[in-house]
């Protein structure tokens, strides 16, 4: 009885394979719109606008023996982990984008998100959210996923041990906003 069923299944599979057209199917990855399963919240922070990517800051790289690959599709990226606070003096360092670091700006450093880009950062302890501009690389070697400027950290009410979620915001050339950072979110103007 088992042999008969096996034979029937094989024959059915062969017939199904022969009956269709000889067309190869390709899987195409189309970014899906951000899904919202709750109320929409208006958040403030950096003003997302289209900016040309910095060619030198967006190359895959290696640091301290570890390889970093720049995120090519931020629409399919989200990350959760601990935040660091970048507390340097104003104008004391240049960022990876070539700008002078300013702790009063709503900026952040991330090891692999495109520069410049924008992201919604959520403090998972208190639910606060802001938009930051990613303009630098880091943090490195301290198990942190993002380094926030002092202004960003203060707005989120974070410490160096606060768990956050990073959701990129994609800005198209016409200024339209999309991506994971726009789910249930509008950006205050």
Residue ranges and their predicted role:
Residues 1-18:
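Sec-dependent bacterial lipoprotein signal peptides
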Residues 18-189:
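Secreted/periplasmic proteins
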